[in-house]
């Protein structure tokens, strides 16, 4: 049986090539594993920043159980308003930032890919030089097989793969740009909200003592219900003697059959498009009450005059219509369909 009888250096060279290929295969596997681990870390980071349940309203309810002084209530009101503004700003800002960042990342990815392709080069003379060096080594060390096997093999330079996604790698310039863009969006959003809050609206309300007495005042969208009741009290005192000794804490504001807490602002209902049992809470113009119209199904965005009521009157008459329909406002409760009973 014929056998191949080549130089001993050929066997050594073959072993070198086998070891070289094995090392390259191991490096490739390590690179794949590292990319998979980095992608998993990125996924875990994204999950940590997912939206979570906002418990601000629940905390306010639990902290205002029982009698609370006016100063404490004002402090809690201010803290709640600031917290709500931050949450709304963060939510709106996150949406706008995500869109802009995706566009920027796509643009940078394409530019980086073009740059890497342009810089990627392979030297054709490198292979020839390596072959010449190996031939010289074979001629000089034919009888020293083991020593030849241990000689280091010159590695070819591996070019970078332009298709690999490197967006998850740390990049100080990119992070600074994202932070700057995020801050600009936040400031722009806050300016828009302040402009909305400063806009003036006309509030039509009815002082309710068993019958309605309609009045109108002008307020700003950023004003709270407490500020509105203070203004309404100034208007009503000259016509109703029972209100001359009353304070804001003795009054209730009823809008669409819901008892609205004093710390809420008109802005809160406008930006969230909140709805009540019998109409929207974000409209303050007046339409006919649907309970006095033949077809109650035509009501959509029509609003009714809110009622200003003394707490003492409500406690005496809460079992009688319309007070029997009133219930405390709950921001978590949805009134997608209006009711008239």
Swiss-Prot record:
InterPro entries: FAM50A/XAP5_C, XAP5. Residues 125-147 have a biased composition (Acidic residues). It is found in: Nucleus. Pfam families: XAP5 (PF04921). One of its GO terms (cellular component) is nucleus. Residues 1-27, 80-147 are annotated as: Disordered. Residues 80-115 have a biased composition (Basic and acidic residues). One of its GO terms (biological process) is chromatin organization. Disruption phenotype: Fam50a depletion results in early neurogenesis defects, abnormal anterior development impacting the brain, eyes and cartilage apparent at day 5 post-fertilization (5 dpf), and lethality occurring by 6 dpf. Keywords: mRNA processing, mRNA splicing, Nucleus. The keyword rRNA-binding does not apply. Belongs to the FAM50 family. Probably involved in the regulation of pre-mRNA splicing. This is Protein FAM50A.
């Amino acid at each position: 049986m014929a056998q191949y009888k080549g130089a001993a250096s050929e066997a050594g060279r073959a072993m070198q090539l086998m070891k070289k290929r094995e090392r390259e295969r191991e490096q490739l596997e390590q690179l794949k594993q590292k990319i998979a681990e980095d992608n998993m870390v990125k996924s875990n980071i994204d999950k940590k920043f997912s939206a979570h349940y906002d418990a601000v309203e629940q905390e306010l309810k639990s902290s205002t159980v029982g009698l609370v002084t006016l100063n404490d209530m004002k402090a809690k009101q201010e803290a709640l308003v600031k917290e709500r503004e931050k949450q709304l700003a963060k939510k709106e800002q996150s949406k706008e930032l995500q869109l802009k960042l995706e566009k920027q990342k796509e643009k940078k990815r394409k530019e980086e890919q073009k740059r890497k392709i342009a810089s990627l080069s392979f030297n054709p003379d490198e292979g020839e030089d390596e072959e010449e060096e190996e031939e010289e080594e074979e001629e000089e060390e034919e009888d020293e097989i083991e020593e030849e096997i241990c000689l280091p093999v010159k590695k070819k330079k591996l070019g970078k793969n332009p298709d690999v996604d490197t967006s998850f790698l740390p990049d100080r310039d990119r992070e600074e740009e994202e932070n700057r863009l995020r801050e600009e969006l936040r400031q722009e959003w806050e300016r828009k909200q302040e402009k909305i809050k400063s806009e003036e609206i006309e509030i039509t309300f009815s002082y309710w003592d068993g019958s309605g007495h309609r009045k109108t005042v002008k307020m700003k969208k950023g004003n709270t219900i407490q500020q509105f009741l203070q203004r309404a009290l100034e208007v009503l005192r000259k016509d109703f003697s029972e209100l001359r000794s009353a304070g804001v804490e003795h009054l209730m504001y009823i809008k669409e059959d819901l008892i609205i807490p004093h710390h809420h602002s008109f802005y809160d209902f406008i930006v969230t498009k909140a709805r009540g049992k019998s109409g929207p809470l974000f409209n303050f113009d007046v339409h006919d009450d649907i309970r006095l119209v033949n077809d109650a199904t035509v009501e959509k965005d029509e609003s009714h005059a809110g009622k200003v009521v003394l707490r003492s009157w409500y406690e005496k008459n809460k079992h009688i219509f319309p007070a029997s329909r009133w219930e405390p406002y709950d921001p978590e409760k949805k009134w997608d369909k209006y009711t008239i009973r």
